[in-house]
Amino acid sequence: MCKDTYFSGEAIQLSDMLRAREERALRQLHLLKEYPEGSLLSVTMNIPGPIKTSPKLLEAFDIVIKAIQTALADDKICYQLRLLPTTGYEYYLITSLPSRDLKLKMIALETELPIGRLMDLDVLVLQNDLPHSISRTVLGGSPRQCFICSKEAKVCGRLRKHSVEEMQTAISKLLHSFFNKDNQSSSSDKTG
């Protein structure tokens, strides 16, 4: 397994990331105002460091998007948008499903899918005319765990407990394991 397989994309600058965050917040606000009766799902990847995109990261992203679409197959989807900027992949979906129910489905998906941990599956609502993310802990879910030490991810991030190199190595191992397991099941399906 080579880390470069997963982190082979274009390096970005902090200013690019800040601009992308601002644009994402504006897009979320616009969608929430355009679809006031719907629930907004905003999907991005948790990728540390200056490289946010690569063919393998896109493959993982698209697998999760397909899983989301499958999980919501019985619900009305009003709008979808998939963006592929170098600052990180983005996906937006508006559904008629109540936001609480949507968040519960996304928590389940994030937990069931081995690469779900790489995603931010944010369900947003308008609060005081601004996008507000529904927290998994408000719905009884446990806080996200760190890829490396299994402690609370926000604490590790705030303290910069792990280097970018450590986190990229952990993500590479997770993806390598996922893609190899997936290929093995595809091979056994064909031979069986």
From Swiss-Prot:
Pfam family of the protein (one): CitX
Reactions catalysed according to its record: apo-[citrate lyase ACP] + 2'-(5''-triphospho-alpha-D-ribosyl)-3'-dephospho-CoA = holo-[citrate lyase ACP] + diphosphate
One biological process term in Gene Ontology: prosthetic group biosynthetic process
Top-rank taxon, per record: Bacteria
EC number: 2.7.7.61
Single GO MF annotation: holo-citrate lyase synthase activity
Record keywords, A-Z: Nucleotidyltransferase, Transferase
Biological role: Transfers 2-(5''-triphosphoribosyl)-3'-dephosphocoenzyme-A on a serine residue to the apo-acyl carrier protein (gamma chain) of the citrate lyase to yield holo-acyl carrier protein.
NCBIfam families: citrate_citX, PRK01392.1
Family from the record: Belongs to the CitX family.
Protein's name in the database: Probable apo-citrate lyase phosphoribosyl-dephospho-CoA transferase
Originating organism: Streptococcus pyogenes serotype M1
